[in-house]
Amino acid sequence: MTEPTVGSTDAELLAEPRLVVEPGVAARVSAVAGPVLQGMGYRLVRIRISGEAGCTVQIMAERPDGSMQIEDCEAISRALSPVLDVADPIDRAYRLEISSPGIDRPLVRRSDFERYAGHLVKVEMAVAHEGRKRFRGMIGAVEGDRVHLQRDDVKAGEERNVLLTMEDISEARLVLTDELIAESMRRGKAAAREMRRNLGLEPPAAPHAKISEKTTKNTKPKKKPAPTNTKKHRLAAERARRGEIEPDEGD
């Protein structure tokens, strides 16, 4: 596995804060995990703590380009486990689980909403918007820290287009559609090509065919040699044989 390479654009994405964040114990875990992930070249997406079958701490992370491999999850787990043991943000035994966001991923940053504009999303508000906490619709334009949503669950007398403040959102998750799956596959192929290129495994592009120099030279066609067996030449040769003229008269 190659560690994520951080360019100027990636550095900006790594430093971008989350606008949709967790409360309580998950927030304490986030305060510990976030800097570690950023230092490794990853972005924290979400932390979820569940008590089913014991306590599980699930940490979703991704590379700046949105990709995430099994090797990335393993590397994060190895680096983060001892840090969490020392910081001890959870007062009971737990199992650490590192995962990718998945196709129907949570949206937590401004760039997430921009990246998935035109896709369907379900939104749960922490702070009600016009008396309503649940929305579903198509992601529209982003204005600062607010996002337009064209609702598909609108009822009579309700506004179809709403403008939601991201910091008031408790959860926003993409809805699995054929369009989203196709987009995810396209992004996955692009990320795989980039990884192969970084590893030197991507075959070089086919060289452009070189045009023959013969076809590019601006040369004049060669003159055909003058004929040397014309009637004039034969008569001159006969006269020269007789000694009547010089032998080169036929030229």
From Swiss-Prot:
Disulfide bonds: none annotated. Keywords: Cytoplasm, Ribosome biogenesis. The keyword Cytoplasm applies. Required for maturation of 30S ribosomal subunits. Gene3D superfamilies: Ribosome maturation factor RimP, C-terminal domain, RimP-like superfamily, N-terminal. It is found in: Cytoplasm. Belongs to the RimP family. This is Ribosome maturation factor RimP. The gene is rimP. It holds the Pfam family DUF150_C. Residues 198-251 are annotated as: Disordered. CDD domains: YlxS_C (cd01734). One of its GO terms (biological process) is translation. Residues 235-245 have a biased composition (Basic and acidic residues). Residues 217-234 have a biased composition (Basic residues). GO terms for cellular component: cytosol.
